[in-house]
UniProtKB/Swiss-Prot annotation:
The lineage of its organism: Eukaryota, Metazoa, Chordata, Craniata, Vertebrata. A ubiquinone binds at H201. The gene is MT-CYB. It is a multi-pass membrane protein. Belongs to the cytochrome b family. The cytochrome bc1 complex contains 11 subunits: 3 respiratory subunits (MT-CYB, CYC1 and UQCRFS1), 2 core proteins (UQCRC1 and UQCRC2) and 6 low-molecular weight proteins (UQCRH/QCR6, UQCRB/QCR7, UQCRQ/QCR8, UQCR10/QCR9, UQCR11/QCR10 and a cleavage product of UQCRFS1). This cytochrome bc1 complex then forms a dimer. Heme b b566 binds at H97, H196. GO terms for cellular component: mitochondrial inner membrane; respiratory chain complex III. This is Cytochrome b. Heme b b562 binds at H83, H182. It is found in: Mitochondrion inner membrane.
Amino acid sequence: MTNIRKSHPLMKIVNNAFIDLPAPSNISSWWNFGSLLGICLIIQILTGLFLAMHYTSDTMTAFSSVTHICRDVNYGWIIRYMHANGASMFFICLFMHVGRGLYYGSYTFLETWNIGVILLFTVMATAFMGYVLPWGQMSFWGATVITNLLSAIPYIGTNLVEWIWGGFSVDKATLTRFFAFHFILPFIIAALAMVHLLFLHETGSNNPTGITSDMDKIPFHPYYTIKDILGVLLLILVLMTLVLFTPDLLGDPDNYTPANPLNTPPHIKPEWYFLFAYAILRSIPNKLGGVLALVLSILILIFMPLLHTSKQRSMMFRPLSQCLFWILVADLLTLTWIGGQPVEHPYIIIGQLASIMYFLLILVMMPVASMVENNLLKW
């Protein structure tokens, strides 16, 4: 008799994806972040669902409903902080996951990579709208500044912004629709993640060498299930340390002040995970130019397969490319730091140099380094 997990229509799908899946024998801990992202998404959906039971998306009561969750709802404070810091963990895993893809050339799986970039945009949109919901000062002004960027689009810009706002400023209509979108998008993300996995399982996983591993596969269970469980335990350890010891470490104190359209905070800035893109936006003195650079800073990932000039897939055996990759990481950390600083000397020039460096590294230096390596290896 066939095992039920191999014959049952539903169990068969789970079996082929998580149990009998042939996986390369040499994938490192950098391959753990996919499963961690899945866990993050589940945590966010569950905590978000419980928050939505007590939250009201009205400008008059939104701020006090969040206060009510923290003070009066049973374990409301832990649910709220798990959701807020869960977003930070989500983005840490996302950046690691994308970085792994860049380093080991995983972007050569075109469909998987493109769905991944769409997922990245969707998660960023969800996080942005979620930040608006508590209706604190930074929520309101962040929403005002970021939505206003669309007014840089020629001809239709102003109409588009007012259409998104549902009025002539960020107000009740904006908050209600942001809540609606923030609620529905995670389920769309979950569906996209399924498609992401579907395409991945068509080709099988990449591995650190970038060489085909068809002749050396091992079953996903028990080897990688146990490895993923270790990753999940470490993720929960870090998340709960944040939540229970320093829940406001990554937040902005301004968001504990209720939104006031008549009073602008001295430094408007988004959450830490958007600071690198915000720094690129601010480094260009022209509004439309800044918006284009902001979009391109993420959209550039789509073009990675076209910019791959090396005869090797992975960077494992390419010291020049490795060096440039880590310079890119340092550059992104610099941009993140600059994004949180006020617009004054010397931060302006540092931000501009780091922004130029970001695009130069990806568009020019890394493809050239790959060609140099090809020549050095006489390929």
